[in-house]
Structure formats: structure tokens, C-alpha cells
Amino acid sequence: MGLCKCPKKKVTNQFCFEHRVNVCEYCLVSSHSRCIVKSYLHWLQDSDYNPVCTLCNGNLSDGDVVRLICYDVFHLSCINNFAQSLPPNTAPAGYTCPNCKNGIFPPEKMVSPVVEQLKQKLSATSWAKAGLGIPVAPLEPLLFSSTVSRKIPEKRPEESLNTSVDHDENKYQRRGAIDWFSRWFGNRVNTKKQTYDDPNASLKRTMMIFFLVILAFVTVTVIFTRVGRNAAANDPFLDPRSNPHIRVEKDS
């Protein structure tokens, strides 16, 4: 453990092999972004280091670099090529550091200057968006066809039988007995189409037919009776005053 020499005076166990000083994460980002940084205990065991990118063996002083959360440093282009060489269906946990095999992507709740810089540099790459929680691609709006069929819909048989629906041109007209009977009969036909078992359906149908026959007979009888009375009242042969054989004396 040591104390960083920056104004923050953070206690840290990270050690810069090149400058041989303890460094905190703020200094890693601002002043030691290309340095080889490991734990102070590691430096005590082996102080040798090679400031090159292990993926291309190029010097870390050249090109843009990125530091992973394990503190290993690589060229940004090299780590990008390395990740793109993996299968496209690789899970975020499958992207690991080429050196220590620790995960490249930081945990969701991990917050530090190194993590923020790592997210900033990897957010521009397509393979890292899923691991960083960035939407891969915006959802495209669904395109609906605006084609409208000009075919006139055919009238269903049920609609043609249902005469209880009034049309605009005759809905205010007076309804007669025939129209009422036709609408009632149409409703009865539609009712019979319902799929239910009524044990008294045959009896009801017979009673209804009998009632209609009696009603028709009474109606015809009344009509003919009235017509006969009117004809008899206006028949000159039934007028006693028109009969020459009948004499009617006038009162004096």
C-alpha cells in the first residue's frame, strides 16, 4: 500500500513500473494512460516490464490505447480486431483480456475513472455495445401497406334475411301489417338458426300455425261480412220502396 503523490493523496496499491511511484485511478487516466501499472506486490516480485502491446508487439507510445479494468493496456485498434475475430454470437462474458483472461466489460454498478474512460472508448465499437448496455440498433418503425381493396364486399345471407334493419330512405315511412309480418317472420327464421335443443319446438310451431290460420279465417270472415252488408244496403232490389207490388201508405 502506498500514497499517491497527486493532490488527492489517495491510498492505493497500484504501482507504475515506468515512473516507480504509487498511482491512483485518477492519475492512471490523466498522467499514466500508457504506462504499465500493476500491484506494488507484483513489482516487488518482478520489476521487469516491456512497454509494448502484447497483441501486436508495437510500442504503447504509438497510436490510441485503451486500459481495461484489469489495468492491462492495448492499442485500441488491436483490441477491436481481437474482439471482432470472435464469433458474432459471443456473449458479453466471452470477451476477455488476452493476457489475464478477466472480463473486458465492467460490472453494471462498477464506477471509477478507468471504467468511465473504457466505456467512452469502446462505445464507438459495434461489438461492445451489448456488453456496455447500449442498444445495438434503434428499432425501425413497422411499415404498413396502404393498399385498400376496392372490391365491394358481398352481402351475407344472414344480412339479406334480416329485414328488421331500416334503411335511411324508408326508416320514417309508416309500417303496414304486411311489413310487420315479414319482419316478424324474418326474425323467426334467424332465431331457428340458433343451435339449441328445445323439446317443445314442434308444439310451439304447431300452435303458432294454428293461431295464424284462425286469425286469417276470422279476418277474412269479418272482411266479407262488412262487404256483404255494404252491398245489401245499396242494393235497389232489397229496397221495399222500389218494389211496385208493395204499397206504402203515407200518414195523413
UniProtKB/Swiss-Prot annotation:
PROSITE patterns: ZF_RING_2
Species lineage: Eukaryota, Metazoa, Cnidaria, Anthozoa, Hexacorallia
Compartment annotation: Membrane
Stretches annotated zinc finger (B box-type): 1-43
ZnF (RING-type) ranges: 53-101
Major site of localization recorded for this protein: membrane
Membrane topology: Single-pass membrane protein
A GO term, aspect molecular function: zinc ion binding
Top-level lineage group: Eukaryota
Native species: Nematostella vectensis
Family to which the UniProt record says this protein belongs: Belongs to the ZFPL1 family.
Official protein name in the record: Zinc finger protein-like 1 homolog
Keywords: Membrane, Metal-binding, Transmembrane, Transmembrane helix, Zinc, Zinc-finger
GO cellular component: Golgi apparatus; membrane
Stretches that traverse the bilayer: 207-227
